[in-house]
């Protein structure tokens, strides 16, 4: 007589549908807090529906997607999962605001080998907080449990955001001209870029991430969530014709600022107009990193750069400070000769 074969289930293969359902129940309250009036229906459908907000004459949708890179590795190693969701939202919505777009809705993709409901709930709670800060609705997502694809407690995630801007109000850098002034908005730390180098510095310096650093642990300082600039900038746009914005992410100053400048213009940055936050000095010293490489990899304390007309500089600075931003005069736009570098940093870092 042949042996009876074992009856297999999806759970036997490593996929726990019940855990996925438990996660959905845990995050319903998070999703509800982010709801906008344009959102139609609730979570759980095959697709999410959202109307264009009233008041737009020629609405243009702006979409973006991003992740948080190897900052996740550090978060996983330190078992701190409640802030990387904020990072995920920030990386997307800060890219949208650069073009003048108001973020409307956000979706996330979360993938892991074995779903830990508590960890995933912490991550999604952070995503919800980021959406609240930016006024963006969390309308859906995908949780993928994929045994054999990720080791242990590892996970990865990606975010997808859509915003809207009036066609005549799109900010694309075409108005930038010599004489325009640069404004810096302070970052909260490394944000979500350069973490492969950060982790290398931690390795070669044998640094203790639990050691005190400026009143926090070193690990907490490095994992400080990316600052979200959406609401203050949307308010500024109502009063000032901002000519360009640059989100200082991977590639630092050298690569991000030229993305929003016409070929005939260059940004002259006053390198002594601000003090690098201590974490960047620590990274440079412990990694023996050149100043050029620092500006190429990290934001060095500047999370966003604005280009405004010269006669709007003081008004812009005053408004941004009133709105809670640490803002300062960073430099100016000058004419660039053919083939000339489009970013010049004058004066050393403090």
Swiss-Prot record:
It catalyses: 2-formamido-N(1)-(5-O-phospho-beta-D-ribosyl)acetamidine + ATP = 5-amino-1-(5-phospho-beta-D-ribosyl)imidazole + ADP + phosphate + H(+). It is an enzyme of class 6 (ligase). The keyword Iron-sulfur does not apply. It is found in: Cytoplasm. Pfam families: AIRS, AIRS_C. GO terms for molecular function: ATP binding; phosphoribosylamine-glycine ligase activity; phosphoribosylformylglycinamidine cyclo-ligase activity. Its main location: cytoplasm. Pathway: Purine metabolism; IMP biosynthesis via de novo pathway; 5-amino-1-(5-phospho-D-ribosyl)imidazole from N(2)-formyl-N(1)-(5-phospho-D-ribosyl)glycinamide: step 2/2. The keyword Transcription does not apply. Keywords: ATP-binding, Cytoplasm, Ligase, Nucleotide-binding, Purine biosynthesis. One of its GO terms (biological process) is 'de novo' IMP biosynthetic process. Its EC number is 6.3.3.1. GO terms for cellular component: cytosol. Belongs to the AIR synthase family. PANTHER family: TRIFUNCTIONAL PURINE BIOSYNTHETIC PROTEIN ADENOSINE-3, TRIFUNCTIONAL PURINE BIOSYNTHETIC PROTEIN ADENOSINE-3-RELATED. This is Phosphoribosylformylglycinamidine cyclo-ligase.
């Amino acid at each position: 007589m042949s042996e009876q074969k074992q009856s297999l289930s999806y759970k036997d293969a490593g996929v726990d549908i019940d855990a996925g359902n438990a996660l959905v129940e845990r995050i319903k309250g998070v999703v509800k807090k982010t709801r906008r009036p344009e959102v139609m229906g609730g979570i759980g459908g095959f697709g999410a529906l959202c109307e264009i907000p009233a008041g737009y004459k020629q609405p243009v949708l702006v979409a973006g997607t991003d992740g948080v890179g190897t900052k996740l590795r550090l978060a996983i190693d330190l078992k701190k999962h409640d802030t990387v969701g904020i990072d995920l939202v920030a990386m997307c919505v800060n890219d949208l605001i650069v073009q003048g777009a108001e973020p409307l809705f956000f979706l996330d993709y979360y993938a892991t080998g074995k779903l830990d409901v508590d960890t995933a709930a912490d991550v999604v709670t952070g995503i919800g907080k980021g959406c609240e800060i930016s006024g963006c609705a969390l309308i859906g997502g995908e949780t993928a449990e994929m045994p054999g694809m990720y080791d242990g407690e590892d996970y990865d995630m990606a975010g997808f955001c859509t915003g809207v801007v009036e066609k005549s109000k799109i900010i694309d850098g075409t108005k930038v001209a010599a004489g325009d002034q640069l404004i810096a908005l302070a970052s909260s730390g490394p944000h979500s870029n350069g973490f492969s180098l950060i982790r290398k510095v931690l390795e070669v310096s044998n640094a203790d991430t639990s050691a005190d650093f400026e009143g926090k642990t070193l690990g907490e300082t490095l994992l400080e969530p990316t600052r979200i600039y959406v609401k203050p900038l949307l308010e500024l746009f109502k009063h000032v014709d901002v000519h360009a914005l640059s989100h200082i992410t991977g590639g630092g100053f050298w690569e991000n600022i030229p993305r929003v400048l016409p070929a005939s213009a260059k940004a002259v940055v006053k390198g002594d107009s601000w003090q690098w936050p201590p974490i960047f000095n620590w990274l440079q010293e412990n990694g023996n990193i050149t100043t050029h490489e620092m500006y190429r990899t990290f934001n060095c304390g500047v999370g966003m750069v604005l280009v405004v007309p010269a006669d709007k500089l003081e008004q812009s600075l005053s408004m941004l400070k009133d709105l809670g931003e640490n803002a300062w005069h960073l430099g100016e736009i000058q004419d660039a000769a053919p083939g000339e570098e489009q970013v010049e940093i004058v004066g050393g870092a403090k």
